[in-house]
Every structure is written in C-alpha cells, then in structure tokens.
Amino acid sequence: MSNNNTQKPLPFGYQFIAGAVAGVSEILVMYPLDVVKTRVQLQKGTAVAGEEYYNGMFDCLRKIVKNEGFSRLYRGISAPILMEAPKRATKFAANDSWGAFYRNLFGAEKQTQSLAILTGATAGATESFVVVPFELVKIRLQDRASAGKYNGMLDVVKKIVAAEGPLAMYNGLESTLWRHILWNSGYFGCIFQVRAQLPAAEPGNKSQQTRNDLIAGTIGGTAGTILNTPMDVVKSRIQNTSKVPGQVPKYNWAWPAVGTVMKEEGFAALYKGFLPKVLRLGPGGGILLVVFTGVMDFFRNMRGE
C-alpha cells in the first residue's frame, strides 16, 4: 500500500516479496493466538462431560500448553506460512491495483475515504480466492477433535479430496469472501482516515513514518476484526464440517449460519474468540503495514525512485 496517493505502484514481483516478508513476520509472532481463537470458536454451547472446554483465551492457552505441549500452539502453521506470501501479496497488490482502477473509473485525482473502503472490500474479495484451501487445512489441523485424523498438511489435503472430492477444498468460500471483504474494508478504510488525522511524518524521518504506520495499521486491524468476527466464527464452523453425500450441513451458508448461531447460542457466540483474534490482528495489522511499507521503501530506494 503506497504511503501517498500519487506514488506509482511497484511491479507485482516487488509487491509479492514485500507482502511475503510482512505476512511471514506477522504469522511467526502472532500465530499462537490464532490457534486459541479457532479452538474457542469451534466450541458450541456449554461444557460437555468428557470433552475439553475453554473458559476464554487464557484458560485455553493454559490447557493447550499443559495437556498438549507448547508445540501444539504452532500446529498447522505450515499452511498459513505457505499461504502468507500469496495472501499478503494479493492483499496489498490488489489494494493498490484496485485503488488505481477506481480512481480512474470515478475520475478522482486522489484516494478518498469512500474509495479506500471500496478498494479494500474489492481487494478482500480478490484475496479470498487465494486463501480458502489453506484456511480449510489450517482449521482441520487446529481443531483438537480432529487432531488424530491427520498427519500434517498434505495428509489433510489427501483425505479431504478422497472423502469429499476436490471441490471440497473450497468449502467455505462464500463465508471467506464476506470475512475478507469486511476486514479489508475496515482495515484500509481506517488506515486512510487515521493517516489523515496523524501528524505527517517529516520527509526522510523513518521513525515518524513507522510510528504512523504502526498506529494506523493497529487501529485498522482492530476495526476490521470488530467487523468480521461473526463471519470468522461461521467460517470456522463451515470449514470444520465434513461434507456427507445427500446430507445438508448444519453450517452451510454464511448468513443462515449467523442466524443459527444466534438462535442456538445467543449473539455473544458470534464474537467467540474475539479477544485472541483482536490481540493478534490489531497489533498484527500494525506489523503488516510497518514491514510492508519498509520493504517497499527499500525497493524504491534500490530502484532510485
């Protein structure tokens, strides 16, 4: 994402590398919170005798480390690590590309708040098509109930395709579309607005630029998380449900699934896992923006721009 509206986007290869570095940096720091978030989101109702139940984020962290070992907090990380390069490259490259497209379409010389939200939403939809198979694998590996079924990422893919067919790898596409549209519109929309409100960084002052990016990215990540958590909850449920021929899954489409969760578990259930999610994606959004901007600035200097 360019620091200003007149800066020409770099070629896709540079976007890809910068997005990959930013994404992998964020995932290595924040991944355990994603595991906790998924475990909490997959819980339905109240505790059942004989089944592990988590009373919030810290209880979940404690029980995972105590009962399964610290390494379990990084179970399933191979899928997101492999996903981060194309995912983050698509996020930022699509945002820059769609931004230029919409400015040209509407005859706008500079980015506006409305265009920032529209651009972010479209970039989120674009990104969704890249991430669905990786998200599906990650969810299956993170769920404790299916931990013994799979021996790593490739085994998950093999067993899903064998049991449910190749199209099952895109199970949850619709809910993922909604999740990413909401998060990206909130993220990039807030970044635009917060940057406009912050004191402008002095030319060449990297510490001020980093400060502004960290603040804008963290606020943007928090706003995106507030907007998209209900869709993330139902996405986790949809992707953790194996397809059975002739049987309609309980969680199938995003908005009906939202209604089902609200009816059976109450509105608060739509925000299960919110604390670990916002603690990850709030600061994580800041990390993403700081690293991405830093790598892109490095490439611009290297190219003499």
From Swiss-Prot:
SUPFAM superfamilies: Mitochondrial carrier. It catalyses: citrate(in) + H(+)(in) = citrate(out) + H(+)(out). Keywords: Membrane, Mitochondrion, Mitochondrion inner membrane, Repeat, Translocase, Transmembrane, Transmembrane helix, Transport. The keyword Membrane applies. Solcar repeats lie at residues 10-101, 111-197, 211-298. It is found in: Mitochondrion inner membrane. One of its GO terms (biological process) is transmembrane transport. The keyword Transmembrane applies. Belongs to the mitochondrial carrier (TC 2.A.29) family. This is Mitochondrial citrate transporter D. It comes from Aspergillus niger (strain ATCC 1015 / CBS 113.46 / FGSC A1144 / LSHB Ac4 / NCTC 3858a / NRRL 328 / USDA 3528.7).
